[in-house]
Amino acid sequence: MYHTHMHESLISVTSTVSVSDASYAYARLTRRDDSDSSSSSASSTKNSKSAECTGSKQQCQLPTDSSHSTSVTVGVAVAVPVGVIIIVLAVILCIVYRRSKKEAEEDNDPDFEGDSEFLPTMKDYSPGINHLYSSDSQQDFMEKTLQQPPSDPFVGSMHSSKYNVRSATPPAIGRSWYVDPFQLPQESNDSNSLRDFAMRVQEDGLGGYKVAAESRNASQTSLHPDNFSNCTPIRASSRFQESESFRSHGSPIHNNQLSRGSATEGANKQFTFPNEDNDSSSVSEEAEVLNESNESASNDAFEFELDNSSEKTHERNLRFGKDDDNYELQDIREAEHMNDRSSSKSQDDDYYVSLLSPNEEEDIKRMKSIYQVYLDRAKTMKKEEDKADNANDISQEENRVDNIVQNPLPSIKINNNDNIDNNEVPEAKHLVKEALPLNNTNLAEYGPEMAQSQKQYPVQDTLTVNDTEAAPSNRIASSIYSEAIQPLNYQDQYQQQEQSPVYNGHTQYPGNGYSGNPQQQGYTAQFVQNPQWYGVPTPQQQQHNHPQTLETIGELPTPAYLAQSASSHSLTSFKRPNKQQLLQLQTARLNGTALNPVDHPEMFYSPTNDAYYAPQQQGQYMKFNENGAVPSPYQLRQSVVMTNPSDLTAKPSYKPAGSFRSVSATNSRNNSLTTQNNIYLQQQQQQLYNSRVSGILEETDVVQPPSVGGILPHSGSQDDLRKQLGSSHNYTVN
């Protein structure tokens, strides 16, 4: 039984061990399967990756840094635009450099005549001719002489004389001078000046174009004796004279300028070769015509002075090279060469003088009138004719002065010992007037000039008349300020002494000057004192010696210094009326019965300068004549109605910009004396002040109270300024 039990326990142990071994083996098998599956999956993945890459290891290996592609992209995006911009700028700079270089070469071009001239290009010249005088705009001289001989280039040109000198060439040799004036410039290797281009105009039917084109040529070929003295003929060399086409086209050369026409040549030949085989009648006619032309040439409006350079003292050779043939044009001044020139003259050269047509004469007169107004240099230059005219004028003035000295006008003698103060007018003392008889001569025999002179220098009332001093010592009547102070005597009754001269018992100066028989113009001045009594001082009681003695009016200060200034000044001086006014005048102003000078000018201002009106106490006005006296400053002021504007019209009220209402007529007169002394109007204004137009604007913001005289005082100290600013309408106004 024990053996059986042991056997059963052994079997159970064995079974237990076997179960544990089986579980362990299963776990190992399971773990092995997992490792095999993982290894197989890894190998399969590796195999799949290795299957995708078909290159070398370096090719299949991915780069560790991926910024390579980014840098390439950024570099291309930046470098390409920058390179394109640099290339474009280089092209532009190259073009600008070439253009500037070309302009610099054109600026240094000797053919350049100026910015105001248009230089057209003409046809090409002959290849063998070298133009040596392109800088003087004369490079086409040989072309005109050799290729295109001018048959009649100056037809209708404005010459100084009445006649025109022309050269007639046979049709076989010369051809017509015809060029289209509206010809467009053509492309060429060389360019001519505007003067040469404008000279080539059509002969007929151009009108103003012809006048404008040939004005310069006409001025250079004017028939003036001075021009002929500065001209010398040209003798060509033997080879130059052999050609038949060159015989009749020699032209003169000025001292410093080549002539472009044959008109001057014809004139020179007329003066240089008087011994030609011509009829006596034709010679005499030509001489008469030339004399007339010389006389008329002195008044030439188109005459220009030809500059005489230093080349006048030596000979100048002009050479035009063409291969081996050198044509020489020598400026020779010996008489023997002039004889050779006259002997070599061709029979085909027939020079004559012809009259101008009426149209040409009319054009000449028109151009002369325009030239004399705008371009005449004679007005700014001294000439012998002007000296002669001045001498004649001086002689006439001397004769006139002699006549005046024989009959001297009354002059003014001023006492230099007068005590003149800067601000005060000295009181007049008892001045003794001496009645000096004037020369009782008949002024009519010296004509109206003497009478006019006597009118311009009348006798002064309060000044001593002297018949020994010269007339120019008088003061001109148009002067506002007189040289001497007219003495006045201020008394309680405003007594004024006025001396009116009596001339032979009647008045000699009735307003406009002399009247009646001129035989009565001789007179003897006698001064009689006529004291007049006034209730109101006359305006002439304010006399000043000189403008400097008046009040100094300062310039308007800048706004920055306006606060520190004592008062606000302007260039216009406003002065309040004097407080010492008569009660009657104040009453008349308050009642509105004072006369307005604008409404009644005849009561205050006389139609002439020799009378004025003075107000009286009874309201009447009396006229007092100052016969023959120089107008006083107050009379000159009255002649232009220099009246204080505040005395003529009522002062307007202050109306700021942007007002919401229209000020009534009563409020527009709030600063006048009538409004200030009228209780009814003041009550109306007070009602308007208290009433509100709207909730935005107050009446006191629009209308200035009557008690406020002005915005700022025009004179006074800083205290006055503060007082004025403190009494504004924004505060309580009494």
From Swiss-Prot:
Domain of life of the organism encoding this protein: Eukaryota
Bias (Basic and acidic residues): 309-327
Keyword Repressor: no
Keywords, in A-Z order: Membrane, Phosphoprotein, Transmembrane, Transmembrane helix
Any single biological process term in GO: negative regulation of mitotic cytokinesis
Regions that span the bilayer: 72-96
Residue numbers carrying Phosphothreonine: T169, T221
The keyword Membrane appears for this protein: yes
Residues bearing PTM Phosphoserine: S137, S191, S193, S219, S222, S251, S369, S672, S717
Primary subcellular site in the record, as a coarse category: membrane
Composition bias type Low complexity, residue spans: 37-51, 280-299
Protein family (similarity comment): Belongs to the SKG6/TOS2 family.
Miscellaneous comment text of the record: Present with 1550 molecules/cell in log phase SD medium.
Name listed for the protein in its UniProt record: Protein SKG6
Organism of origin: Saccharomyces cerevisiae (strain ATCC 204508 / S288c)
Recorded name of the encoding gene: SKG6
